Amino acid sequence: MLFRSVVNKPRLGCRQRGVPFTHPLQSLLQCYQCAKHDEHTSYGELGAAVPPFGCAFSTVPDMSHVLAVANEEGIVRLYDTECRDVQRLVVKEFMAHTNAVFDIAWVPGEHKLVTASGDQTAKLWDVKAGDLIGECKGHQCSLKSVAFSKFEKAVFSTGGRDGNIMVWDTRCNKKDGFYRQVNQITGAHNALDKQTPSKVKKRKPYVRGLAPSVDSQQSVTVVIFQDEHTIISAGAVDGIVKVWDLRKNYSAYRQDPVPAKLFPYPGNSTRKLGYSNLVLDPTGTNLFASCTDDNVYMFNATGLKTEPVSVFGGHQNSTFYIKTSVSPDGQFLLSGSSDHSAYIWQVSDPKVPPVTLTGHCQEVTSVAWCQSDFTKIATCSDDNTVRVWRLKRSSEDSAQSDKTETVGWACQKKCVPPSMAANLCTPGKPSMIPSSSLMSSPTPATCAPSYTGDLPMPSSTPVSALLPIPKLQTPQRLNGEGLGASPKQTSSSKISIKDWITRTPKSSTRADTKTPSPRKAFTPVEQYPSVSSTRVQMPYEKRAKRRLETSSEDVEHVCLDHCNCVMELEPGLKKAKLDLCSFSEKERDGSDDKCLRLSDLSRGFDQEFSPGPSTSFLINGTVNPPLSPLSELKSDLRDKENSSPEKNWLSALGHKFKSDKSSPQNKAASSPSSRNSTSKKHPTRNAPNSPVSVPTTPGSMRKICTYFFKKSE
């Protein structure tokens, strides 16, 4: 063989004690390339390009160069990889299924193959004549995998999405025109329920014709034969590789089947992940399991240990369509990847960076290494192409490849050392952080867990997290520094949580003034001297007004165009608030009413209150003018969030005030001239010592500012 003559060729001047130095195979992996004539597009029935799902080289000695490819539309094509004539490249083509073919397997040493399709059937074909030999029915969902035993040409196994593993024997007679399974493992990879041994969940008996629920079953993604009596399988969710003894009848038990041996999930993920493919080396000792956590685990299939012997990484496995293959001598492992490349690892040294076969523009799914020729590799991709990679074995082939357009090449993947990974971290700036108790850099803490598989890398730390942190101050301290100084404008991407809470859909970010804290509604309100008639518009005036229902149907709150009513509550506050209305300067000059301060309310209204005509309030950092009698009568609003059916002194006082309003005395007392007569009847209006049992309804609740005002005696 030409390849062996190149590999075993001794190096000149390197002979030592009669033993020649040979070329290491690792150095030859970078010589793989794919020429333009070795790229084949997979077409469907109507001529449209469709992705290929499975490929496999023939096991017949005189047809080992024939590659079988099955695509998404159920078409199987046989390619002659040694033929350079485009017209004679496709040896055979036939429609195997009316649905997608997910896996394909050759009968050992014969011109036959079996296809596993999404139409819930497996079919045995004679590839020379293109005839259907038999059809296998029994699965209730799509078939995902099919495998033959090396020791039996008539026995093969299938696994499907219904969670069942079925064994078929083509030597049995056909019943109803198709084959029936000779052995079945139902629920092979069901999720283990947390239950006591005394309460074992019994499996429902199988009813023919009734498809099991896919939600209650766990899909079997791959099955292979270890020997004529042993099957190895893997699932999509449980993360366990199970070994089954076919000499045991698993259908006779009503509980979930128990495997003869299992390999638990060895990864560091917080949840168990499934496997997309299983493959054994030529000796049958090493088992390679391709997991969806971007690792390929190698187990010792003949030993007693269940921990992986080696782990191969560097690629990406995000789907269950990615397959693996082993070189004919068992020294190298080939796998597809989601990053548009195929990877080759050295089995004896997993730490060596893999060799990548680059050229596809989509995910590389199924791969196959020709078992009779080390220099030939086939890859399938979602870019609707099948590529055959060849090894440049001489200078003549290299010169010929220069004339031909190359669409794929091999290269050694660069390994990032741990020191460079640490340099990718965002540098810390402790000088910009005033507090020494905060973390000065994104370096993990000492007590942080060792596993960071589900955590972001240190290099992903945003730089904005290292910006200077403003001083933590209370609202009173912020006001003490000066109300006139406006902070820097905050961008929409750096709005604090407090800004999001106090904003409305139509309001913009407060850039001129700092957002007042919702807790300021409960702080004592101080009096300030009279302000100018030109009132500065505060942020709350720009908020969208929301009309609330009135306390009664006959009283309606009418807001003028120049009224600055604050009728929207701060989100998250369930406490009573003030509802103040401020009118224009013309109405403010003509009003001579008298209002109380909140400090007087807290002292129980024991002190006399006689404010001047220019008395104002400061609520939430906003200077408001005093209330007028008209505003007191027209601000009869019912707060939906503040209303409460609890009977207290405030509700009793409101009920009494409502009853007084309906009397003729209150109607006469609405004018300023009749206040003296009404004030004599009610000299004081202090809060009662105990609550009065008066029926309270949400409609009787009124604003607190409408109840308290001094009557001139």
UniProtKB/Swiss-Prot annotation:
Record SUPFAM superfamilies: WD40 repeat-like
Sequence segments annotated as region (Disordered): 474-544, 604-623, 635-700
A GO CC annotation given for this chain: Cul4B-RING E3 ubiquitin ligase complex
Sequence ranges of Basic and acidic residues compositional bias: 635-644
This protein's record includes keyword Endoplasmic reticulum: no
Predominant place of localization: nucleus
Compositionally biased tracts (Polar residues): 504-516, 612-623, 686-699
Coiled-coil positions: none
Annotated PROSITE patterns: WD_REPEATS_1, WD_REPEATS_2, WD_REPEATS_REGION
UniProt-listed Pfam families: WD40
GO molecular function: chromatin DNA binding
Single biological process term from Gene Ontology: rhythmic process
Keyword set, alphabetical order: Biological rhythms, Chromosome, Cytoplasm, Cytoskeleton, DNA damage, DNA replication, Nucleus, Repeat, Ubl conjugation pathway, WD repeat
Quaternary structure, from the entry: Component of the DCX(DTL) E3 ubiquitin ligase complex, at least composed of cul4 (cul4a or cul4b), ddb1, dtl/cdt2 and rbx1.
Protein family (similarity comment): Belongs to the WD repeat cdt2 family.
Protein known as: Denticleless protein homolog
